[in-house]
C-alpha cells in the first residue's frame, strides 16, 4: 500500500539579523518591551532577496537531501502572503528556476496557516493521482509589507522559508492521521496586509498596498481559544489522546500565546519547541522552519506523532497530526 512520507526538510533565512536594540533606534520601543510581550530577541530581514529567492534556496536543499532530480518533481506548492508578484505565482517562478518542467506549481494564500493548508492540499493531490513527489514550501518576505514606524507590528515579523519533500512510499501507515481546518471570514479585518482600494474615476491610477495591520488583543484571544480547539479536534479525529502527541509544532507568533495554548491543552511546555526568539513571526514559513530545526536537532524522529498547527489571517486555523 502506498502512503506519503516526509523524506526531506530544509529551511533558509537571509543573513541580515536585526536585534531589538537596533529596532529601538528607529522607533519608540526597547529590547525589554519586545521580549516581555513577544519572546522575540531578533529577526532575519531580507536585503535584496525576494520570496522566490528564499523558496528556491529551500527547494534546492530539499532535492539535494533526497537525491531527487528536478524533472522528477510532480507538484510544487508555496504558501505565502508576500509573493513576488500577483502573477506569476511564486511557485511558478521557483518551478522555472529549478527547471522542474514536469511539475505543476501554484501558491496558497492563507497567511500564517498557509503551510498547513498546503500540506493538506499536496497530500490530497498526490493520493488522488499517479504523482509521486511534491515540494511544499512556506516562504515569506514580510519586511516589505511592514510600516517600520509602527511598533505594534514592526517588532513582530521576520523573513525566511522552510519546506518539506513529500514522496509516495510503500507503507501501511498514512502520513496525516487527523486534521482540522477552519476559516473565520467574519474576523478577516483583524489581520490585514497589502490591501488595495480601487481609485475613483477613469483612467485609473495605480493602487498602493496598505502595510500590515493587526488587532493584537483580538488575535491573542482568538489564538488562545481556537488553536487548542483545533488541535483537540484533529487529535480526536486521529483516534489519539493529547498525551499521545510527542511534540506540538505551532506557528511561532508569540511566546505568550504558545504558553497559553500548552496550558489550555494540559500539556508540558517541553513538548512545544520554539524558535521565535531568533526568527520572530515568519508567517507561513514558521512551521516548516521549526520542523526542520527539530529534525536536525534529533528532537523529532521517525515514528514520532507530532501536531503541526497554525493560525493567522482570514482569520484561519489549521492542524495536522503527522506520523513522522
Swiss-Prot record:
The lineage of its organism: Bacteria, Bacillati, Bacillota, Bacilli, Lactobacillales. Catalyzes the condensation reaction of fatty acid synthesis by the addition to an acyl acceptor of two carbons from malonyl-ACP. Catalyzes the first condensation reaction which initiates fatty acid synthesis and may therefore play a role in governing the total rate of fatty acid production. Possesses both acetoacetyl-ACP synthase and acetyl transacylase activities. Its substrate specificity determines the biosynthesis of branched-chain and/or straight-chain of fatty acids. It holds the Pfam family ACP_syn_III_C. GO terms for cellular component: cytoplasm. Gene3D superfamilies: 3.40.47.10. The keyword Acyltransferase applies. Homodimer. Pathway: Lipid metabolism; fatty acid biosynthesis. This is Beta-ketoacyl-[acyl-carrier-protein] synthase III. PANTHER family: 3-OXOACYL-[ACYL-CARRIER-PROTEIN] SYNTHASE (PTHR43091), BETA-KETOACYL-[ACYL-CARRIER-PROTEIN] SYNTHASE III, CHLOROPLASTIC (PTHR43091:SF1). Its EC number is 2.3.1.180. The last Arg residue of the ACP-binding site is essential for the weak association between ACP/AcpP and FabH. Residues 252-256 are annotated as: ACP-binding. One of its GO terms (biological process) is fatty acid biosynthetic process. It is found in: Cytoplasm. It catalyses: malonyl-[ACP] + acetyl-CoA + H(+) = 3-oxobutanoyl-[ACP] + CO2 + CoA. GO terms for molecular function: 3-oxoacyl-[acyl-carrier-protein] synthase activity; beta-ketoacyl-acyl-carrier-protein synthase III activity. The active site is at residues 112, 251, 281. Keywords: Acyltransferase, Cytoplasm, Fatty acid biosynthesis, Fatty acid metabolism, Lipid biosynthesis, Lipid metabolism, Multifunctional enzyme, Transferase. The gene is fabH. NCBIfam families: fabH, PRK09352.1. Belongs to the thiolase-like superfamily. FabH family.
Amino acid at each position: 500500500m502506498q502512503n506519503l512520507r516526509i523524506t526531506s526538510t530544509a529551511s533558509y533565512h537571509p543573513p541580515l539579523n536585526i536585534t531589538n536594540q537596533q529596532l529601538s533606534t528607529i522607533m519608540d520601543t526597547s529590547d525589554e518591551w519586545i521580549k516581555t510581550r513577544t519572546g522575540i530577541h531578533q529577526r532575519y530581514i531580507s536585503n535584496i532577496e525576494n520570496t522566490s529567492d528564499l523558496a528556491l534556496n529551500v527547494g534546492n536543499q530539499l532535492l539535494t537531501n533526497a537525491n531527487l532530480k528536478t524533472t522528477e518533481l510532480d507538484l510544487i506548492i508555496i504558501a505565502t502572503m508576500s509573493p513576488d508578484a500577483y502573477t506569476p505565482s511564486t511557485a511558478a517562478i521557483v518551478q522555472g528556476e529549478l527547471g522542474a518542467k514536469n511539475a505543476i506549481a501554484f501558491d496558497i494564500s492563507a497567511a500564517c496557516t498557509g503551510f498547513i493548508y498546503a500540506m493538506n492540499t499536496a497530500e490530497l493531490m498526490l493520493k488522488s493521482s499517479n504523482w509521486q513527489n511534491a515540494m511544499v514550501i512556506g516562504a515569506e518576505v514580510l519586511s516589505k509589507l511592514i510600516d517600520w514606524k509602527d511598533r505594534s507590528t514592526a517588532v513582530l515579523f521576520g523573513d525566511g522559508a522552510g519546506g518539506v519533500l513529500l514522496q509516495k512510499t510503500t507503507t501501511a501507515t498514512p502520513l496525516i492521521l487527523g486534521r482540522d481546518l477552519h476559516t473565520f471570514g467574519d474576523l478577516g479585518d483583524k489581520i490585514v496586509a497589502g490591501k488595495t482600494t480601487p481609485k475613483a474615476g477613469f483612467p485609473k491610477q495605480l493602487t498602493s498596498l496598505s502595510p500590515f495591520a493587526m488587532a493584537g488583543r483580538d488575535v491573542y484571544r482568538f489564538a488562545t481559544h481556537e488553536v487548542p480547539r483545533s488541535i483537540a479536534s484533529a487529535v480526536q479525529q486521529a483516534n489519539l489522546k493529547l498525551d499521545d502527541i510527542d511534540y506540538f509544532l505551532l506557528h511561532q507568533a508569540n511566546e505568550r500565546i504558545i504558553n497559553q495554548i500548552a496550558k489550555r491543552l494540559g500539556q508540558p511546555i517541553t513538548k512545544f519547541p520554539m524558535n521565535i526568539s531568533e526568527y520572530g513571526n515568519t508567517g507561513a514559513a514558521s512551521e516548516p522552519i521549526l520542523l526542520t530545526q527539530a529534525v536536525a536537532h534529533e528532537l523529532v524522529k521517525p515514528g514520532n506523532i507530532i501536531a503541526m498547527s497554525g493560525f493567522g489571517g482570514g482569520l484561519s486555523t489549521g492542524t495536522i497530526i503527522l506520523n513522522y
